[in-house]
Amino acid sequence: MKVGVIGAGTMGQGIAKAFAQIEGFTVALCDIKQEWAEGGKNKIAAGYAKLVAKGKLDQAEVDRRMAAITAGLKEDLCADCDLIVEAAFEDMKVKQTTFGELDKICKPECIFASNTSSLSITEIGKGLTRPLVGMHFFNPADRMKLIEVIAGVNTPAETVEAIKKISTEIGKSPVQVNEAAGFVVNRILIPMINEAAFIKMEGVSDIAGIDTAMKLGANHPMGPLELGDFIGLDICLAIMDVLYKETGDSKYRACPLIRKMVRGGNLGCKTGKGFYIYNADRTKTPVDAL
């Protein structure tokens, strides 16, 4: 099966790896510029090289996986894809435009899936000549087991079942979800991160204290502020804004501190600074401890 992954950023790279590590799948890793697509593939290769150096992966297996991934433009690589998994920027217009272009490129039997973490599948798929389904991976996509499979208003049962079957084939556990803002995981998880930011903003505790409390008191592997940095504070903000817009419920109001940090370009791990500063030696320091 040939899978077109649209978007060669962190999530797109992880999704490409999730398919390429299973024999029988090939991947077209696409972005809007050739160099961006190639950059995504190069980052995958660099990650694999580290695993080989640590003795966690065999070089022959890396070579097989990398040979299964082709990087380029969707116009050049997606015409014969059997499945498209879109992992573009979390913006309705971007996703609608992307799928509109793919609808003219891909063969009629190609399945269209979006990795959106919060947006309406029905709205993204409006105007397409084929159904759209949600196939929501979790970061890191090659290791996290869950895939939320989201049915929009016009998504046929057979499309949902096809995605559940593919998810199982790549070693994932699919959970079927009806369309709703944030689906299941992000409807619960992102407001928790948002509330942790309010607790910090109100001076209830410092960053390390909040994260330590949740790790030790709730048995969470990562504290909420650390997790927000890992996800990306821009993504957390975008999801909170969608939840608030879709529900009108004030409990989903984004914390002003997160909005301020995003405006300042402090998005977390990917920019080197969020609630923590990420040092070259892979340690991190809470920004309020400096």
Residue ranges of each PLM-predicted region?
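NAD(P)+-binding Rossmann beta1-loop-alpha1 motif at the extreme N-terminus of oxidoreductases
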Residues: 1-50, 54
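Rossmann-like NAD(P)-binding element
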Residues: 10, 35-39, 50-111, 119
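NAD(P)-dependent Rossmann-like dehydrogenase/reductase catalytic/cofactor-binding core
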Residues: 6, 24, 157, 161, ...
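Rossmann-fold dinucleotide-binding core
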Residues: 111-178, 183-187
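Acidic/polar active-site rim loop that often engages polyanionic ligands
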Residues: 25, 79, 140-150, 221-222, ...
